């Protein structure tokens, strides 16, 4: 079973995603803020991915959360979620990164996680 850390400040969105991922057999550790998310990353070496909203209404955004998480565990896959497409226009995604624009079907997130979980689909950077 995959372990994923979900960082989403909107409680309703977080609950829907936790349920959908759980139904797909993913163990989800959720956080409503960057600090909690980074504590989870540091204490969960078996984590395979971080799913993070970009606009977290905090001092740091989802891109910074991902950067700090990768400093702790360079094997992580990162999935960014946001309602603002312009986030993707100013960023070149690496092989271990994906982006999903809100609103989206939770099944899309499950598919992206499965894709990133497959070593054949995740070439070295």
Regions found by a protein language model. Give the residues of each.
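C-terminal output helix
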Residues: 104-117, 121-124
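Conserved phosphotransfer cores of two-component systems
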Residues: 42-45, 58, 68-75, 91-92
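Conserved phosphotransfer microenvironments
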Residues: 53-67
């Amino acid at each position: 079973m995959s372990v994923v850390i979900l960082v989403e400040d909107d409680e309703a969105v977080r609950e829907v995603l936790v349920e959908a991922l759980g139904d797909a057999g993913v163990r989800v550790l959720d956080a409503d803020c960057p600090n909690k998310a980074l504590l989870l990353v540091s204490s969960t070496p078996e984590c395979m991915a971080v799913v993070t909203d970009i606009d977290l209404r905090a001092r740091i955004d989802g891109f910074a959360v991902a950067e700090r998480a990768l400093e702790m565990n360079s094997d992580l896959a990162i999935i960014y979620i946001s309602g603002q497409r312009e986030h993707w226009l100013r960023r070149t995604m690496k092989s271990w990164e994906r982006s999903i624009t809100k609103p989206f079907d939770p099944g899309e997130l499950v598919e992206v996680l499965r894709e990133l979980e497959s070593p054949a689909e995740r070439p070295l950077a």
